[in-house]
Structure formats: structure tokens, C-alpha cells
A protein has these predicted regions:
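Conserved serine/cysteine hydrolase catalytic core
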Residues: 132-192, 196-197
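Alpha/beta-hydrolase active-site loop signature
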Residues: 5-9, 71, 188-189
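Gly/Ala-rich beta-loop-alpha elbow adjacent to hydrolase catalytic centers
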Residues: 41-46, 50
Length: 210
């Protein structure tokens, strides 16, 4: 199940009103309505969202899967780690919008920065659906405890050709915050488009692990 987080996709929350707190609350509300435990997958920046959700609902989450995602320790922010990722391709193409506390990525970098191993129609689709990203969550420190967050097993899927969240920073993160298992894919930042079958097989493998 993939959901539209606040301000994203079909969710019409004004982007200036989107906060990390409301995003995590939406995830928690969703899993509260599902019988039994769930496995949460976070991609890219949304790694911070599933981490914070695990802190609030550890009893409802069976496993956490970080897909080329920000895996940030307690008290740190996503922005601190993205600043360390000097090899990423996206930063020169980011435009800040202070009036809405958001930023956008210039379409010129979509193909080479996000989808270089994907079909051309994926890039064209992205031009239609990618929009402003809220800034606030990137500067919000995570509040995680050993009792809650660290009680949920973590798995990492490293994208070896990622130009958005580079392999360098991915390895820094899963080294500093160890996971039960790390999988590697020879893909860009978007393996759900370039190698969906291989990604699905990894998801299934993680789901079956005890």
C-alpha cells in the first residue's frame, strides 16, 4: 500500500502547512487502522518519517525498510546528513521558496539525477507529478529511543548508482545506525521504476525473515 503523504500526490494540504509532525501522524493513523503489524518502507527523505513512526508505534510495526533512505540517529536532522553528501547531483538544481517554506527540483536534472536507468516515459511522468517539497521536516531533529525505535528490526536497501542520496552517505547512515541486513541494488534512486521485479523480491525476502 502506497499513501499520499500531506501535501503530496492527491493530498491537498497546502504545502506551507505540511510539518513533520502531521506527516508522521498520518502514517500512525493509517497503521492504527490495520489489524496486526505492518512493515513500513521509507524511500529517500521519508526514511525519517518511518523512523519517527516506529518511535510512536513500535508495537504495530514488524520491520522497517529503508530504500536509499535517510536513516538518521536520535537528535539529528536529515539536513545534517544531506549536507555531508557532497557527491550528490541535485543541490545545484534546487530552488528555495521561502513564501511557502518549500523547495523545488528543476526538471532538467530529473533524468540524470533520479531516473538515469529508467525508461524515458518515467521522466516525462515525473514532470507532471513532482512538485514542491516541504522544508521543515529536513530541519526537525528526530526523537528516538532505544526502548521504542531500536526495538523494531531495520533493513537497508542501498542503491549503488544513486545520484540523489549517494552510496557514500547511504553507507555512512547504515554504519552509524546498523541494520539487521543490507541489500544492494545496481540502480539509480528509483528502483521501483527501473528494477521493480528485483525490488519486489527483496521486499518478499525481508518479509519472510525471522
Amino acid at each position: 500500500m502506497a499513501i499520499d503523504l500531506p501535501g503530496m500526490g492527491r493530498d491537498k494540504t497546502p504545502i506551507q502547512d505540511v510539518k513533520m509532525k502531521s506527516t508522521v501522524e498520518k502514517i500512525c493513523q493509517l497503521i492504527d487502522g490495520i489489524e496486526g503489524k505492518v512493515i513500513l518502507v521509507g524511500h529517500s527523505k521519508n526514511g525519517i518519517m518511518i523512523s519517527q513512526a516506529a518511535e510512536y508505534r513500535p508495537q504495530k510495526i514488524e520491520k522497517l525498510i529503508y530504500l536509499a533512505a535517510y536513516l538518521i540517529p536520535n537528535g539529528k536532522t536529515q539536513r545534517e546528513y544531506s549536507a555531508r553528501d557532497e557527491g550528490g547531483w541535485l543541490k545545484p538544481y534546487v530552488t528555495q521558496h521561502p513564501e511557502t517554506n518549500s523547495h523545488t527540483l528543476h526538471p532538467d536534472i530529473y533524468k540524470q539525477g533520479l531516473y538515469h536507468d529508467c525508461d524515458e516515459d518515467i521522466t516525462e511522468m515525473a514532470k507532471c507529478i513532482l512538485s514542491n517539497e516541504p522544508v521543515e521536516s529536513g530541519f526537525t531533529p528526530l526523537h528516538l529511543t532505544n526502548k521504542n525505535f531500536n526495538s523494531v528490526p531495520r533493513y537497508y536497501i542501498e542503491c549503488m548508482e544513486d545520484r540523489a542520496v549517494t552510496p557514500f552517505i547511504q553507507r555512512v547512515m547504515y554504519t552509524e545506525t546498523p541494520c539487521k541486513k543490507v541489500y544492494c541494488m545496481n540502480t539509480s534512486h528509483s528502483p521501483f521504476f527501473s528494477k521493480p521485479k528485483e525490488l519486489t523480491e527483496i521486499f518478499c525476502d525481508i518479509a519472510e525473515l525471522q
